[in-house]
Amino acid sequence: MEKYNNWKLKFYTIWAGQAVSLITSAILQMAIIFYLTEKTGSAMVLSMASLLGFLPYAVFGPAIGVLVDRHDRKKIMIGADLIIAAAGSVLTIVAFYMELPVWMVMIVLFIRSIGTAFHTPALNAVTPLLVPEEQLTKCAGYSQSLQSISYIVSPAVAALLYSVWELNAIIAIDVLGAVIASITVAIVRIPKLGDRVQSLDPNFIREMQEGMAVLRQNKGLFALLLVGTLYMFVYMPINALFPLISMDYFNGTPVHISITEISFASGMLIGGLLLGLFGNYQKRILLITASIFMMGISLTISGLLPQSGFFIFVVCCAIMGLSVPFYSGVQTALFQEKIKPEYLGRVFSLTGSIMSLAMPIGLILSALFADRIGVNHWFLLSGTLIICIAIVCPMINEIRKLDLK
């Protein structure tokens, strides 16, 4: 237990740096959307920007996981933050001399996404080296709260800053945030995994396969991953349809869209705080199942509402947000607890890659059918499918056994 001495100081030091970086990155992300919308007015350009945001994780995730497990995760986290900072610095310098070309913004978005693809699994793999097992779920809850704060703050702050500053000034703030995050990681002593690096298989492909093999050996986690992939496949396209249902079905305005987004993020914040405060609850599969069920019920009710039911829809959005930490946070803690630390980089990169690949497939299907059957009916159909997933999840014996020590 010696490695957990002063774990709170270590975790919250890193957490504070990540808080600054996450919020500044979210602000910049929104500002870039404003910039691309203003300069091009093209839905294709915005779709490309979104695609570049998750493409590296989806395509290169398994290979990145091998590198995270082979090398010092602390150095990887610092390096990823500095790469993000360097990419932003290039944009800042160029913007002083000329108007930023769209192609350059796209390249920087891609580079930032690569940095995130390294940073996220490294951070998830480092956490169980710092935090006692019984505290992992609570820490995941606090991390979810931080993410929701960035969702709430970033649109308003980005809109304010973009109205008074040039884009390069906002980029400079994000560069500073990345530097602060790298400094907080640098000053924390993170336990090492001994001679792990020297003992790794020199065959890169075989190491990637080991990530899947480790998952398949734990039948409960593998089954949970499959359930989660199906859940993301159904749920993620709904994220893109909130503006559509707010304006087209409920006859709202951009203000109504903002209200639904703030409601969702506020619910997510409350859910993360509740998970952080009461994260020692042992029946975690029950929490995951309840989370999925809450999402399904909220979507189903949203799809059944009349066009005058916007207020109830806002309440449903808050419940959806409330449910999110009890799925993603608890699932992350389960993986951190059940997988050996030397494999966590590969496992988290692999799971992130699978989830990322499920997103575009679901988006394509929703784009094909939502307009044909009506966006409200798509919410109803998605909610019904998610309720079915919630019913099936605890019926799988291997998943139920995950709560057993």
From Swiss-Prot:
Coiled coil: none annotated. InterPro entries: Drug_antiport, MFS_dom, MFS_trans_sf, TM_effector. It is found in: Cell membrane. GO terms for cellular component: plasma membrane. It is a multi-pass membrane protein. GO terms for molecular function: transmembrane transporter activity. Keywords: Antibiotic resistance, Cell membrane, Membrane, Transmembrane, Transmembrane helix, Transport. The chain crosses the membrane at residues 14-34, 48-68, 76-98, 145-165, 168-188, 222-242, 259-279, 285-305, 310-330, 350-370, 373-393. GO terms for biological process: response to antibiotic. Confers resistance to 14-membered macrolides including erythromycin and to 15-membered macrolides but not to 16-membered macrolides, lincosamides or analogs of streptogramin B. May function as an efflux pump to regulate intracellular macrolide levels. Belongs to the major facilitator superfamily. Drug:H(+) antiporter-3 (DHA3) (TC 2.A.1.21) family. This is Macrolide efflux protein A. It comes from Streptococcus pyogenes. The gene is mefA.
